[in-house]
């Protein structure tokens, strides 16, 4: 029998069936060979991790932690995924992880303190789904490698979508619900036709556009 998932190392990427759009985008931004540490329905203590510098991917699901204090020990982390952590309030420590390329946040309704986006200069993908306390997305326009932004069933409090307009690297914005007030979506599509903006139905459009671009190189 397999041992319990008590902070075990794994090489197989955990895929959330609830996060379909990230599944589709996986083929572009994810590396399933990353050395992964996963916690599920258990206590999380970063101080007890052996050889934390070797961990490249962290996945935490259904855990009752309230903050990510101590996570800075994972200095080579490239990907972090947080799912259904209903008591998590402070994720500001993510900003200490300078190697991060991919952040997936899913069903974190109690978050009040967020990380500073501009600090994560290696970020390629940033995804919010049902996450609380999003004051702003300002800073994404400063990220030179960011190609994917996910805004699903969230509200951005300052209602400022200009960072999307200003970004020079964004290719795809997953948009579900109304993260900004009307007519944000209409305006964005008008002013940035080069960015594919929309829900799951737009995945096919994005990949067709991507393939055409590659064929022309």
Regions found by a protein language model. Name each.
Residues 1-66, 73-89, 96-183, 189-217:
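Concave beta-strand-loop units of leucine-rich repeat
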């Amino acid at each position: 029998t397999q041992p319990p998932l008590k902070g075990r190392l794994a090489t197989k990427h955990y895929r959330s069936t609830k996060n379909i759009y990230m599944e589709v985008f996986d083929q572009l931004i994810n590396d399933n060979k990353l050395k992964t540490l996963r916690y599920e329905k258990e206590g999380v203590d970063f101080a007890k991790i052996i050889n934390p510098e070797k961990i490249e991917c962290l996945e935490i699901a259904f855990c009752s932690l309230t903050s990510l204090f101590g996570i800075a020990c994972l200095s080579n982390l490239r990907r972090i995924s947080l799912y259904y952590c209903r008591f998590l309030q402070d994720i500001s420590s993510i900003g200490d992880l300078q190697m991060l390329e991919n952040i997936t946040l899913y069903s974190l309704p109690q978050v009040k303190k967020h990380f500073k986006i501009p600090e994560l200069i290696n970020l390629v993908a940033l995804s919010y789904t049902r996450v609380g306390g999003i004051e702003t997305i300002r800073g994404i326009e400063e990220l030179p490698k960011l190609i994917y932004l996910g805004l699903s069933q969230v509200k951005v409090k300052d209602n400022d979508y200009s960072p999307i307009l200003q970004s020079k690297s964004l290719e795809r914005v997953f948009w579900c619900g109304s993260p900004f007030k009307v007519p944000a979506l209409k305006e964005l599509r008008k002013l940035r036709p080069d960015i594919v903006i929309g829900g799951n139905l737009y995945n096919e459009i994005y990949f067709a556009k991507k393939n055409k671009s590659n064929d022309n190189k």
